Swiss-Prot record:
GO terms for cellular component: nucleoplasm; PeBoW complex; preribosome, large subunit precursor. It comes from Drosophila simulans. Its main location: nucleus. WD repeats lie at residues 104-142, 143-185, 192-231, 250-288, 290-329, 335-375, 379-417. GO terms for molecular function: ribonucleoprotein complex binding. Required for maturation of ribosomal RNAs and formation of the large ribosomal subunit. This is Ribosome biogenesis protein WDR12 homolog.
Amino acid sequence: MDVDNGEGQVQVHLKTKQEHYAVPDVPYAIDGTVTTVELNTFVNALLRQKDGSSDTEFDFLVFDEYLRGRLCDHLREKAISFEDAIEIEYVERFPAPEPQDCLLHDDWVSAVKARGKWILSGCYDNSLNLWTNKGKHILTISGHTAPIKAVDWISLDEETGRFVSTSQDQTAMLWKWNVGSNAVDCVSVCKGHERGVDSVSVSPDGLRFATGSWDTMLKVWSAELDDGVEGSSKRMKESGVRTPKITLQGHRESVSAVQWMDATTLLTGSWDYTLKVWDLSLEGIKTEISTNKSIFDASYSKLNRLILTASADKNLRLYDPRTNQGSVVRNTYLGHNAWVQTVMWSTTEEFLFVSGAYDNQNKLWDCRSPKAPLYDLLGHGDKVLDIDWSNPKYIVSGGVDNSVRVFKSRKALAEDTETK
């Protein structure tokens, strides 16, 4: 660590929030040309001196961004003086997800959603499919008359599962699944959109769901078995047809993404280059964020309150809906080689998210690492259309190669280790 390669030495303090990996809190003089390789060697040497610890792989954050090259280059890029004492935070490296299963379908898989030990998928052959997260096919469900575009779970317990699907046939359908008998009934057909329904999201309490469509409309529906609409015609009730509770107009192109931010707030993304935050209590737009590309997907994190977008280019972008500057991108993530179709934040890890693109790849990211993903999740043989990390144990994706790919995440890998 004392070799001088012409960049000089830097005074650093090594910090970690993982107390069992803490090293003495004193300044260290290190060469400016070090990378994560040399820093890992140095920190592990300090830990061995402290308590004889075995080697651990770490990542290093300098001014809230992952170090991906030489320390001196990182500091220059951020206009930081070499004479300042630099704080470097180190964190145990997130383990690489491991491929578990490939679930083969008869057509493109355009929608996936995991919950508990089940995976729900939707296809371009108009069918829905239920699988276990161990790869066993449970059920094929017919009902839609055009390709499925989105799915979401409403509720799930040991006896009953309820979920919603949307389709290019201009409808959303509510389903009730008897887990024991493995029988599914369509509870309601939701009609009101005038073009294909591209996106769906169920409210946190499971009582409502929202849909976005090519007709540019956002609609909110009851997700209850009995929607309780007084005055609905007897014919509509008997036929199982359901109409929207709320219709919101504001987008100029397809509403390609929708998500509940909380009980009364919705996020939408559109091909019209905008993100919109809707206040349902006022039935109007609360915030609008202008972007420079058509938005294919958007994801809001309840942990960090930030929004990610997948767009008609190779980049993912990070926005803060709380800012007063509605068009400012907080960060751009570079790594895909084709249009990015789908993105989702982790529901349990504040900084992590996953993406899928037309380059046939899924990627796992840390939002503090804009220059490169943590890992490439390989397996798809064609474009990725949807990705899901609702179940913290599994990253699940569907694509044009007619497959769902299942990857074990850290929580599942940890359980495997404990059971060995």
